[in-house]
Amino acid sequence: EKNMRILLIVTLMLSFTAYAQEESSREFADGVIELTTVKVKTNFLQDYLDGIEKTWVAAAKIQKEMGIISDYNVYIGNDGSTVYLTTAYPSWANKAPWSEEQTAEFQEKFRKTISQEDNVELSQSYEDIREIVSVELIGRLVFK
């Protein structure tokens, strides 16, 4: 009986030691990235990029200054008609709805870059030249 106890204790100790030494070779990085895939009609890429520079990029710059996002990027696919928009949030909490103060601050700053009428007009013109294919939240893996 005593030998069985010793054997059981040794077995448990070895299994805990082996389990404690196991370490994952990868982990998720902090934050989350919103990836939007946009298909732009042929010959309208420049028009689309000109438009988002005044709207989406301007808004992203303000959000970055406010600390809501940590980065943003625009990528063009090799087909010349697919655009990838990325918005990096430093944490999932930053993806949450904005407070009234944040909304007011953003609107005040954004109105200095483009009028409400111009923003609506540009945004509506996108409907004719692009299709949003997908919006995904993706995480970045870090390999150790």
Where are each of the predicted segments found?
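Positively charged n-region of N-terminal signal peptides that target proteins for export
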Residues: 1-7, 21
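Sec-dependent N-terminal signal peptides
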Residues: 6-15
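Immediate post-signal-peptide N-terminus of mature secreted/exported proteins
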Residues: 21-45
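Short, glycine- and small/hydrophobic-rich beta-strand elements in well-ordered beta-sheets
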Residues: 22-24, 60-84, 97
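Solvent-exposed, acidic/flexible segments
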Residues: 29, 41, 45-49, 53, ...
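Solvent-exposed loop/turn segments at secondary-structure junctions
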Residues: 43, 76-82, 90-94, 105
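Short amphipathic alpha-helical segments
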Residues: 44-69
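An amphipathic, aromatic/His-enriched active-site/gating alpha helix that lines ligand/cofactor pockets
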Residues: 62-70, 88-136
